[in-house]
């Protein structure tokens, strides 16, 4: 798509699929499976990936969710009626008690600290995703792409919400 649209590069967040584009990881994206206290009170909290099938999932689309069980990666295809392509909308739906959501720490840190969202299924953490600068293959990247990439790497390195810690 970036080639057809004429873009020099794009930023992709998540797990990279195989493609013919060049990708440079600029930082990790850590997340958690979360639910509101109200949702947990009404429906309980899943304790294993298999139990997610009995819960409403708040999703971006038809994605799969991955969880770690020791050194094994478990993949689950959650089901749910609420779908949004906007992280803020998914956070709002989760805090409103509409279901469970796998969300990045950078969007949910304050909500978790305030008690509006609660980490669930913590025995099965999701593997860290990544933020990538992607570009068409071919020549060396233009200076503006290298500068953008370097700035993003610096930002991810300095922000506690992207470092995989529960920084206060």
Question: What are these language model-derived features?
Answer:
Residues 1-84:
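Acidic, Gly/Pro-rich loop/turn segments at junctions of secondary structure
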Residues 1-7, 88-97:
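Short helices/loops that flank or line small-molecule/ion binding pockets
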Residues 14, 37, 105-106, 123-124:
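Short secondary-structure boundary segments
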Residues 23-26, 79, 114-126:
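Short beta-strand->loop
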Residues 24, 50, 91-92, 146:
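Alpha-helical segments flanking ligand/cofactor-binding loops in enzyme cores
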Residues 91-117:
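A ligand-binding cleft/hinge motif common to bilobed small-molecule-binding domains
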Residues 106-110, 114, 124-168:
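C-terminal effector-binding regulatory domain of bacterial HTH transcription factors
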């Amino acid at each position: 798509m970036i080639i057809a649209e004429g873009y020099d590069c794009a930023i992709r967040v998540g797990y990279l699929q195989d493609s013919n584009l060049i990708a440079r990881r600029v930082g990790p994206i850590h997340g958690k499976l979360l639910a509101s206290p109200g949702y947990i009170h009404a429906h309980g909290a899943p304790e294993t990936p298999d139990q997610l099938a009995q819960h409403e999932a708040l999703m971006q689309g038809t994605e799969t969710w991955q969880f770690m069980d020791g050194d094994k990666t478990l993949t689950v295809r959650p089901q749910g009626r609420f779908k949004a392509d906007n992280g803020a909308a998914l956070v709002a739906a989760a805090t409103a008690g509409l279901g469970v959501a796998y969300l990045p720490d950078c969007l949910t840190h304050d909500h978790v600290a305030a008690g509006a969202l609660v980490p669930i299924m913590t025995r099965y953490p999701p593997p860290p995703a990544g933020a990538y600068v992607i570009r068409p293959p071919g020549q060396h990247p233009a200076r503006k792409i290298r500068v953008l990439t370097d700035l993003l790497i610096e930002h991810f390195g300095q922000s506690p919400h992207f470092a995989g810690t529960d920084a206060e």
